[in-house]
Design a protein with these regions (language model features):
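Amphipathic alpha-helical hairpins
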Residues: 2-129
């Protein structure tokens, strides 16, 4: 076990508290990214089981991209990365594209996913501003 001097302890505590404060500020966006990620994964699985799966190829591709970028954005914000804003800008762009594509399909899973993608894009734009 490593012992810290009082000044080292205070320095590390201040650093930890700073990260926690930044994470709390980004929590709404992190939550939106996580909800979008989950919706994309669910929608992807459902689309693969639809009878018109061939018509959904672009949607499926975007769902994969959207789920991945939402996960990455959530991770970058959680660790207070200096690149979080750039990742969130990309996330907003991909979420917008995914929302537009999912919106073309009338089934419940695509409509729900489109709505959550729009919310995520909005939160990511706010975070990146």
């Amino acid at each position: 076990m490593m012992c810290l001097t009082p000044s080292q302890f205070l320095e590390r505590r201040a650093c930890f508290m700073s990260v926690m404060m930044h994470t709390a500020q980004h929590q709404t966006c992190i939550d939106a990214c996580n909800a979008c990620l989950q919706a994309c994964e669910h929608c992807l699985t459902a689309c693969l089981n639809e009878p018109d799966v061939q018509a959904r190829v672009r949607c499926i591709q975007l769902l994969r991209d959207c789920a991945d970028i939402c996960s990455l954005a959530s991770q970058f914000m959680s660790r207070d990365s200096s690149y979080a804003k750039q990742i969130c800008n990309v996330c907003a762009t991909i979420c917008d594209a995914c929302a537009a594509e999912c919106g073309k399909f009338k089934d419940e899973h695509c409509q729900k996913c489109a709505n959550l993608c729009k919310k995520c894009a909005d939160e990511c734009r706010k975070m990146a501003a």
